[in-house]
C-alpha cells in the first residue's frame, strides 16, 4: 500500500509547514486589524419585549 510509505509525504508535509511558518505567517501578521481591540467596556443594551397585538 503506497499511502503507508511516509517517505514522499513526510517531506512534503515538512516543507509545507516550513513555508507556512517562515514565509506566509510573518506576512499575515503585519496586516492591521480592521477593528482594533479597545479597553472600553462594551455597552449592552437591554432588548425591549415584543408587544404582540393579540395579547
UniProtKB/Swiss-Prot annotation:
Under Gene Ontology molecular function, one entry of this record is: proton transmembrane transporter activity
The listed locations are: Mitochondrion membrane
What's a single GO BP term from this record? proton motive force-driven ATP synthesis
Where the protein is mainly located, per its record?
mitochondrion
Which UniProt keywords are listed?
ATP synthesis, CF(0), Hydrogen ion transport, Ion transport, Membrane, Mitochondrion, Transmembrane, Transmembrane helix, Transport
User: What are the record's GO terms for cellular component?
Assistant: mitochondrial membrane; proton-transporting ATP synthase complex
Topology within the bilayer: Single-pass membrane protein
Q: Locate the region Disordered.
A: 34-55
Name by which UniProt lists this protein: ATP synthase F(0) complex subunit 8
Role of this protein: Subunit 8, of the mitochondrial membrane ATP synthase complex (F(1)F(0) ATP synthase or Complex V) that produces ATP from ADP in the presence of a proton gradient across the membrane which is generated by electron transport complexes of the respiratory chain. ATP synthase complex consist of a soluble F(1) head domain - the catalytic core - and a membrane F(1) domain - the membrane proton channel. These two domains are linked by a central stalk rotating inside the F(1) region and a stationary peripheral stalk.
Question: What stretch or stretches form a coiled coil here?
Answer: none
TM ranges are 7-24
Superkingdom is Eukaryota
PANTHER family of this UniProt entry?
ATP SYNTHASE PROTEIN 8
- InterPro entries for this protein: ATP8_metazoa, ATPase_protein_8
Tell whether Mitochondrion is among the UniProt keywords: yes
Please give the family membership noted in the entry: Belongs to the ATPase protein 8 family.
SUBUNIT field = Component of the ATP synthase complex composed at least of ATP5F1A/subunit alpha, ATP5F1B/subunit beta, ATP5MC1/subunit c (homooctomer), MT-ATP6/subunit a, MT-ATP8/subunit 8, ATP5ME/subunit e, ATP5MF/subunit f, ATP5MG/subunit g, ATP5MK/subunit k, ATP5MJ/subunit j, ATP5F1C/subunit gamma, ATP5F1D/subunit delta, ATP5F1E/subunit epsilon, ATP5PF/subunit F6, ATP5PB/subunit b, ATP5PD/subunit d, ATP5PO/subunit OSCP.
Amino acid at each position: 500500500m503506497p499511502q503507508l510509505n511516509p517517505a514522499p509525504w513526510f517531506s512534503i508535509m515538512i516543507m509545507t509547514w516550513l513555508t507556512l511558518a517562515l514565509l506566509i505567517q510573518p506576512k499575515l501578521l503585519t496586516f492591521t486589524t480592521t477593528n482594533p481591540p479597545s479597553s472600553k467596556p462594551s455597552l449592552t443594551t437591554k432588548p425591549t419585549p415584543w408587544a404582540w397585538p393579540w395579547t
